[in-house]
Design a protein with these regions (language model features):
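Short, glycine/polar-rich helix-capping loops at beta-to-alpha or helix-loop-helix junctions
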Residues: 13-18, 96-97, 135, 156-163
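Short alpha-helical segment that forms part of, or immediately flanks, the ligand-binding pocket
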Residues: 118, 136-144, 164
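Donor-nucleotide binding loops and adjacent catalytic segments primarily
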Residues: 41-126, 160-163, 175-185
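Short hydrophobic beta-strand element within catalytic cores of glycosyltransferases
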Residues: 129, 145-156
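Acidic, glycine-centered active-site loop in nucleotide-sugar glycosyltransferases
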Residues: 143, 160-172
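Acidic donor-binding loop of glycosyltransferase active sites
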Residues: 122-135, 144-145
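Active-site-proximal region of nucleotide-activated glycan assembly enzymes
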Residues: 1-40
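Alpha-helix C-terminal capping/helix-to-coil transition sites in glycosyltransferase folds
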Residues: 3-4, 122-123, 141
Length: 188
């Protein structure tokens, strides 16, 4: 779209891989924030279990779910008893995911979409996500530590640069889903 637009808005001042000829079209507006919503969130800690929220945004959550299934099978039962998973999952994976989680006797909630994202994020201890602009905005607003898997084929590699912003501010771990093995997870 860049060749055809007069200008475009960005959340971040720095836009990686933006061709020089389009930089004059960029208008930095910052992160979206609905003034009617309180952005001073009080973290509602789950006292009994750590809440892990897994969501892939509008695209790309299938690989997150598949990687999650690989990793969760390596976690001990004692550790799993201390965790609750809230998972946004594509409908086509619900049955497989639910079967695996039931077999592991895991505390979980699965939906294809959550309308109450701010409520969930206020209770979340760590998020496992993609790096779309909306997701990054949510993570920043909630000051939420995260493990981020940028969508590898995002245009201009923008998800990597979105994630790098949080990485540079020591707010996340960034993992490349194309170069993962279980040793990668154990180090994280």
């Amino acid at each position: 779209f860049l060749p055809f637009t007069r200008s475009f808005f960005t959340n971040f001042k720095e836009v990686g891989n933006l061709p020089e000829k389009y930089k004059k079209k960029k208008i930095h507006v910052g992160l979206p924030n609905n003034k009617r919503i309180n952005t001073n969130f009080t973290r509602k800690k789950n006292t009994s279990k750590k809440l892990i929220f897994i969501y892939g945004g509008s695209q790309g959550s299938e690989n997150l779910i598949n990687n999650f299934l690989l990793v969760i099978k390596t976690i001990s039962n004692n550790e799993l008893d201390q965790l609750k998973f809230v998972i946004q999952c594509p409908k086509k994976l619900n049955i497989i995911l639910e079967k695996n989680l039931k077999n592991l006797n895991v505390d979980y909630q699965i939906k294809t979409f959550f309308n109450d994202i701010d409520n969930i994020l206020s209770k979340t201890d760590i998020a496992i996500t993609r790096a779309g602009a909306g997701t990054i905005n949510d993570l920043i607003r909630h000051k939420l530590p995260s493990i981020i898997f940028p969508l590898p084929n995002s245009i201009y590699n923008h998800q990597y640069y979105n994630a790098k912003f949080l990485l540079d501010n020591k707010s996340c771990i960034v993992l490349d889903e194309n170069n993962l093995n279980l040793n990668t997870y154990s180090k994280s």
